[in-house]
């Protein structure tokens, strides 16, 4: 009986040991599952990180290219601006050169021709020059005798007492004024009428 008991005890010990081994095995299996899940998550995060790094590199490359394009654009526009300032008057000057030629021809004939022919040549040259200026948007400021004085377009050089013109009107134009595309290029220099003292 003792032997039976002893065998039963041994059998119970073996059962407990076997159960312990089974529990450890199950626990080991659970740790293996967790380890596999963690490794899977790490691989997923590494893949996402690689994708984000590639996207960041592509964005950086795009930024660098666009920055270079912007710098090239700035340099090109600066060069164009300098060229425009340097040669912007080229077509105007090409149109003025024939006027210079006409004046030189008129001066060349001044000795050999009558005064009336020289005056006619000067009139023609003056007309050519005004036509060229008009082509480029330059027109004379209205400033004839009797025109109402306008300080936006006229510069009063002096006041003249006159009875035949209303006060604050142009008496005489000393130098014509000009507009460039409706913006004042230079004012007309004029004398302005005032009421005579003896009439006041």
UniProtKB/Swiss-Prot annotation:
<dbReference type="Pfam" id="PF01025">
    <property type="entry name" value="GrpE"/>
</dbReference>
<keyword id="KW-0963">Cytoplasm</keyword>
<comment type="function">
    <text>Participates actively in the response to hyperosmotic and heat shock by preventing the aggregation of stress-denatured proteins, in association with DnaK and GrpE. It is the nucleotide exchange factor for DnaK and may function as a thermosensor. Unfolded proteins bind initially to DnaJ; upon interaction with the DnaJ-bound protein, DnaK hydrolyzes its bound ATP, resulting in the formation of a stable complex. GrpE releases ADP from DnaK; ATP binding to DnaK triggers the release of the substrate protein, thus completing the reaction cycle.</text>
</comment>
<dbReference type="GO" id="GO:0000774">
    <property type="term" value="F:adenyl-nucleotide exchange factor activity"/>
</dbReference>
<dbReference type="GO" id="GO:0042803">
    <property type="term" value="F:protein homodimerization activity"/>
</dbReference>
<dbReference type="GO" id="GO:0005829">
    <property type="term" value="C:cytosol"/>
</dbReference>
<dbReference type="InterPro" id="IPR009012">
    <property type="entry name" value="GrpE_head"/>
</dbReference>
<dbReference type="InterPro" id="IPR013805">
    <property type="entry name" value="GrpE_coiled_coil"/>
</dbReference>
<keyword id="KW-0143">Chaperone</keyword>
<protein>
    <recommendedName>
        <fullName>Protein GrpE</fullName>
    </recommendedName>
</protein>
<dbReference type="GO" id="GO:0006457">
    <property type="term" value="P:protein folding"/>
</dbReference>
<comment type="similarity">
    <text>Belongs to the GrpE family.</text>
</comment>
<comment type="subunit">
    <text>Homodimer.</text>
</comment>
<dbReference type="InterPro" id="IPR000740">
    <property type="entry name" value="GrpE"/>
</dbReference>
<dbReference type="GO" id="GO:0051087">
    <property type="term" value="F:protein-folding chaperone binding"/>
</dbReference>
<dbReference type="GO" id="GO:0051082">
    <property type="term" value="F:unfolded protein binding"/>
</dbReference>
<keyword id="KW-0346">Stress response</keyword>
């Amino acid at each position: 009986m003792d032997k039976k008991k002893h065998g039963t005890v041994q059998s119970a010990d073996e059962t407990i040991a076997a159960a312990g081994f089974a529990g450890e095995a199950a626990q080991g299996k659970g740790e293996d599952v967790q380890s596999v899940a963690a490794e899977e998550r790490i691989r997923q995060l590494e893949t996402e990180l690689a994708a984000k790094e590639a996207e960041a590199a592509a964005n950086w490359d795009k930024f660098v290219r666009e920055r270079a394009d912007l710098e090239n654009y700035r340099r090109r526009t600066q060069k164009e601006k300098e060229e425009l300032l340097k040669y912007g008057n080229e077509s105007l000057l090409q149109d003025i050169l024939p006027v210079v030629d006409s004046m030189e021809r008129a001066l060349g004939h001044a000795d050999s021709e009558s005064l009336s022919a020289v005056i006619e040549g000067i009139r023609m040259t003056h007309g050519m020059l005004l036509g060229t200026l008009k082509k480029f948007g330059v027109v004379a400021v209205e400033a004839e005798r009797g025109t109402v004085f306008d300080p936006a377009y006229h510069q009063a050089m002096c006041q003249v007492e006159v009875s035949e013109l209303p006060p604050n009107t142009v008496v005489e134009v000393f130098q014509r004024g000009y507009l460039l595309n409706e913006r004042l290029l230079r004012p007309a220099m004029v004398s302005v009428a005032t009421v005579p003292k003896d009439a006041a």
